[in-house]
């Protein structure tokens, strides 16, 4: 017997009892085709049944069986990036230092591990880093707007003018144009009257001013305050070295109650009356609801009709009142539910009586603002109202029975094709749930398919004046559209009504501020909307210079700078929350 060569010593079981799937298939097929074994014999040797061997042979003959990996080009396998993986940790570390993708690529080349800018950007995207926003430092960004890294911004605190730089550049210098009117309204006194809480570090007025700055700069959400942290003008506006961070600003509303907002609005309305931003003598108000839609499925929120979606959706219902004399908002409330929404008209009457000492003279509202029973309560208080009546089947039969001789044509003092409507008046009409009778006007020719039915308890007002007054009610919808566009009122700040309550009150304050600012710009801006004022004036860049007790804001030259030069701006204002320093404006 021939002795086995030492070179052949090994493990024959690796061939006779293969463990890898493809190797076992190969040996079974070889036994069938080369050694001439039957299906059953080849299968028994390598652990297959007879039918499994038949299928294996069939797939092999059909070319469907891949037993060996196809040859590939030399180098790393497709889909792998060993160079990127090797420097991934270093790329992350350099990004946390505030370097851009170009700077990271240059730094890696200097360290002997080169990687192009595109690969660096891909690593940053994979790791969740956003776009790098540059701060004032030449090399490293201090902006917290870059996700995945810590911020170097200091904690919020009252501004220390002793350490404040003598001169600073800012992109928000125009925001400080609103400060003189804040002083006129005496915001610190309003805050104290409302009882807003402060903290050990930040006074209550600065908390409110910080949130107000977000409204005036059209910052959509409180969580977007990061966009303003590096700008000195927004912090100076609130009397702080740096604005509070988003967590602190969000948590502040949780410390408040509805009573805080009501006391603040009462004090604000008194100041608005004194400044001519609201009228106490006429006391005619437009009332309306507005549903702020929630883009989620929070079961706690009730469903209300959302006009922008033409359907009912989960939302926070808010209520607003507008002074018809000045077209300024004077009241807002977000602490409303379906069970209480019908009594909002009564709640506003109570509010205005606390402000002026008497009930409103007249309320103008849509038919869904309140019920007939509440209209009876308003009549008992001596409050006049004008609203629409729902067109029931019986009312439509009554309207259809009228002939052309039953109508009287009147002329309205307004331009357009619908200034000569036809009116049929019923002096005493009974309603289902109203305790007395009301005056009813059936109006056609206003551009609507169906007649408009107006009801009122005012027997003295002339027909022409009543129709004109109700037609002007639509301006409150314009006010709501303005605060949505300018102050992001439709960006729901929370699913908790009390938190939204503070948000809508800040919208009323911001609208009053820009209304006061608008009056200083001259008659050409009498109807300018808040977003126009923000875009043309408040978004102006400039320089802040500190000289002793005087802070001078130099506004950069823009297309509308001549308007500011000729306006009635306060040129020298003492600011209480700046430790009584003076604010001056000048133009470059």
Summary of predicted features, one role per range:
Residues 2-25, 72-86, 196-203:
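Short, Lys/Arg-enriched anionic-surface-contact patches
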Residues 21-37, 85-98, 208-216:
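Short, amphipathic alpha-helical "recognition" segments used to contact nucleic acids or chromatin
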Residues 44-55, 109-122, 199-200, 230-248:
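Short, basic interhelical loop/turn and adjoining N-cap
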Residues 28, 91, 210-211, 225, ...:
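Short, conserved catalytic/metal-binding motifs centered on acidic residues
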């Amino acid at each position: 017997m021939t002795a086995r060569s030492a070179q052949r010593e090994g493990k024959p079981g690796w061939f006779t009892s293969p463990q890898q799937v493809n190797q076992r298939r190969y040996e079974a097929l070889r036994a069938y085709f080369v050694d001439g074994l039957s299906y059953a014999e080849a299968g028994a040797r390598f652990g297959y049944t007879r039918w499994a061997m038949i299928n294996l042979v069939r797939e092999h003959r059909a070319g469907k069986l891949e037993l060996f990996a196809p040859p590939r080009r030399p180098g790393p396998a497709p889909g792998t990036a060993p160079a990127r993986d090797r420097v991934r940790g270093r790329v992350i570390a350099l990004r946390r230092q505030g370097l851009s993708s170009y700077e990271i690529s240059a730094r890696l080349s200097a360290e002997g591990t080169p990687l192009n800018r595109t690969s660096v950007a891909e690593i940053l995207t994979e790791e969740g880093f956003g776009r790098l926003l540059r701060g004032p430092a030449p090399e490293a960004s201090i902006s917290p707007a870059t996700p995945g890294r810590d911020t170097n911004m200091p904690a919020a605190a009252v501004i220390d003018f002793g350490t404040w730089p003598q001169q600073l550049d800012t992109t928000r210098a125009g925001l400080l144009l609103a400060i003189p009117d804040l002083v006129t309204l005496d915001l610190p006194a309003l805050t104290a009257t409302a009882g807003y809480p402060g903290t050990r570090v930040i006074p209550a007025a600065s908390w409110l001013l910080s949130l107000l700055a977000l409204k005036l700069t059209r910052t959509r959400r409180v969580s977007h305050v990061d966009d303003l942290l590096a700008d000195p003008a927004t912090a100076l506006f609130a009397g702080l070295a740096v604005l509070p961070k988003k967590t602190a600003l969000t948590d502040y509303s949780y410390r408040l109650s509805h009573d805080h907002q009501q006391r603040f609005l009462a004090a604000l309305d008194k100041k608005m009356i004194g400044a001519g931003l609201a009228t106490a003598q006429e006391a005619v108000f437009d009332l309306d609801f507005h549903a702020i839609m929630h883009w989620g499925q929070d079961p706690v929120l009730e469903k209300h009709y959302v006009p922008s979606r033409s359907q009912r959706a989960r939302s926070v219902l808010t209520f607003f009142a507008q002074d018809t004399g000045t077209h300024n908002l004077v009241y807002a409330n977000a602490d409303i539910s379906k069970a209480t929404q019908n009594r909002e008209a009564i709640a506003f009457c109570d509010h205005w009586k606390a402000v002026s000492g008497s009930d409103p003279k007249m309320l103008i509202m849509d038919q869904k603002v309140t019920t007939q029973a509440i209209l009876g309560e308003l009549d008992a208080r001596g409050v006049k109202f004008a609203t629409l009546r729902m067109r029931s089947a019986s009312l439509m039969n009554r309207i259809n029975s009228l002939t052309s001789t039953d109508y009287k044509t009147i002329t309205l003092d307004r331009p357009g094709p619908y200034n000569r409507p036809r009116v049929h008046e019923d002096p005493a009409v009974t309603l289902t749930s109203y305790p007395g009778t009301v005056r009813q006007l059936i109006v056609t020719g206003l551009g609507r398919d169906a007649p408009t039915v107006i009801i009122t308890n005012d027997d003295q007002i002339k027909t022409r004046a009543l129709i004109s007054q109700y037609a002007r009610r639509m301006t409150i919808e314009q006010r709501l559209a303005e605060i949505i566009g300018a102050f992001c009122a439709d960006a729901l700040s929370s699913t908790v009504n009390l938190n939204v309550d503070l948000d809508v009150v800040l919208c009323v304050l911001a609208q009053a501020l820009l209304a006061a600012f608008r009056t200083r710009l001259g008659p050409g801006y009498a109807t300018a909307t808040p977003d126009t004022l923000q875009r043309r004036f408040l978004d102006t860049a400039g320089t802040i210079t500190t000289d002793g007790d005087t802070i001078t804001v130099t506004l950069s030259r823009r297309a509308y700078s001549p308007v500011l030069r000729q306006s009635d701006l306060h040129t020298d204002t003492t600011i209480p929350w700046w430790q009584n320093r003076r604010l001056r404006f000048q133009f470059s």
